[in-house]
């Protein structure tokens, strides 16, 4: 099986490492970006990214702007992983096209399960379209 690529975007390197460690153990290949601009550079240059995990509060370009840019080009699944727990923020995420919204602190095992579930759904949908 080819490794499924996940792009993890967070300005906190500890958070990126935590998520990367858990996803790598499950066989995913994790690419990292420290802000939205870096994330877009990576995303636009790698057409094999299957899922993006995105923080909201980051320097240079926040998660909302990053998501808007990604949605101009792709319907890749996106999970927001953020400390912004307000209902208004969560609704904004769904309005912008987020597939999941997970607030910090979070359970890494639940995150891995949600990643797998989203990828299963998108894989099933792609199979049905053929």
Language-model features: locations:
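Short, Lys/Arg-enriched segments at the junction into DNA-binding effector domains
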Residues: 4-5, 117-130
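Charged docking surfaces used in two-component/phosphorelay signaling
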Residues: 17-25
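Helix N-cap/capping motif at the beta->alpha junctions
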Residues: 32-41, 63
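Active-site beta3 strand of CheY-like receiver
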Residues: 46-53
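Active-site residues of response regulator receiver
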Residues: 55, 82
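Receiver (REC) domain active-site loop signature in two-component systems and cognate sites
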Residues: 58
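C-terminal output helix
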Residues: 105-119
């Amino acid at each position: 099986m080819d490794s499924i690529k996940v792009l993890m975007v967070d300005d906190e390197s500890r958070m990126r490492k935590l998520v990367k460690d858990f996803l790598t153990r499950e066989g995913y290949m994790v690419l990292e970006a420290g802000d939205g601009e870096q994330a877009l550079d990576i995303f636009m240059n790698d057409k094999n990214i299957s899922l993006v995990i995105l923080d909201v509060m980051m320097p240079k370009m926040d998660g909302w702007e990053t998501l808007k840019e990604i949605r101009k080009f792709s319907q890749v699944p996106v999970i927001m992983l953020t400390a912004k727990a307000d209902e208004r923020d969560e609704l904004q995420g769904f309005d912008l096209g987020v597939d999941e919204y997970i607030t910090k602190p979070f359970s890494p095992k639940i995150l891995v399960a949600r990643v797998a579930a989203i990828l299963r759904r998108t894989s099933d949908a792609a199979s049905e379209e053929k």
